[in-house]
Every structure is written in C-alpha cells, then in structure tokens.
C-alpha cells in the first residue's frame, strides 16, 4: 500500500492553489498596441485596507490621453471589479494559461496582459482578454477622471 501512495505523494501534490477574488491584492490589465490611441493600462491595488486605482488610456484621436495614479476608490468600486473577476473566473483562466510554444511577433498586433497579485504574494500573469473586465475598468477610469 505504501508503494502506491509514494507516487501520489511525489506527483499529485503539484496542484495549484485555488484563489478567489477575495485573495486579490492587486490587479492590472493592459492592451499594448502600435496605435497610441488604442492602448491602455489599468491597475487596482489594495494598501492598508484601502483601494487605489491607476489608469493610462486613450481610445480615439478626438479625446486626449488620460493618465492618473493612486486615485483612492471606494470599496464598492473595487468590489465591482473583483465581481467581474469572479463572474468571469479570470483567476482560474490566468492560472491555466499556457504561453504559445511558437514565439511569433507581429509588429502591428496588439497584446492583452492580465496580472494578479494575491495576498500571499503569489503573482499570476496571462495574455488573455476579457471584455467585461475592460468595461468595468473603463467605467471606473471615467468616474475617476
């Protein structure tokens, strides 16, 4: 019986910890693009039980680029973003993300990057896009302007 447990002990304990949106201490989502008018980065971070929001974005040629850092946001605003993370199961998606084996670089292509920092210091990164998350982040950015 011990011989059967040994392989399980050696190989079965590599499961990733299951995190929830309550474990998030920072989230960042960005789009890089060759077009300066269609790029953005949003970051929400928790410090001493308060939430702070950074944004740097532009969506068209007619409106100026918006940039700000460390805007204090309400717990409700932070909760709306974390709810989108929870509803879309973005933490698990990011944990399951595997970068492509073939490294191809397209000069005019954009890239989407999602980053989480958890309360225990674990960092989770993925190149994934989620429209719902973009919408709640953009809504908060417009509110903070």
Whereabouts are the PLM-identified features?
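Short, well-ordered, aromatic-rich surface patches in folded extracellular/luminal domains
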Residues: 13-34, 95-145
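A short-motif feature that recognizes glycine-rich, charge-decorated loops
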Residues: 57-93
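Polar/charged alpha-helical tracts
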Residues: 18, 42-43, 47, 76-83, ...
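Short amphipathic beta-strand/extended segments with alternating polar/hydrophobic composition
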Residues: 41-45, 67-76, 121-131
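Phosphate-binding glycine-rich loops and adjacent basic patches that engage nucleotide phosphates
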Residues: 37-49, 74-77, 95-106
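N-terminal export/targeting and maturation segments
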Residues: 13-63
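Sec-dependent bacterial lipoprotein signal peptides
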Residues: 1-11
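Solvent-exposed, well-ordered amphipathic alpha-helical segments
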Residues: 46-50, 87, 109-112
């Amino acid at each position: 019986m011990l011989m059967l447990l040994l392989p399980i002990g050696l190989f079965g304990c590599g499961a990733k910890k299951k995190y929830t949106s309550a474990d998030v201490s920072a989230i960042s989502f960005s789009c890089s693009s060759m077009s300066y008018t269609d790029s953005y980065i949003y970051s929400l971070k928790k410090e001493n039980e308060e939430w702070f929001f950074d944004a740097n974005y532009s969506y068209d040629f007619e409106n100026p680029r918006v940039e700000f850092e460390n805007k204090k946001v309400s717990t409700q605003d932070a909760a709306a973003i974390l709810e989108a993370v929870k509803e879309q199961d973005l933490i698990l998606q990011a944990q399951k993300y595997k970068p492509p084996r073939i490294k191809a670089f397209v000069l005019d292509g954009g890239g989407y990057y999602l980053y989480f920092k958890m309360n225990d210091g674990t960092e989770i990164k993925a190149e994934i896009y989620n429209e719902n998350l973009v919408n709640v982040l953009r809504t908060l950015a417009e509110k903070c302007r």
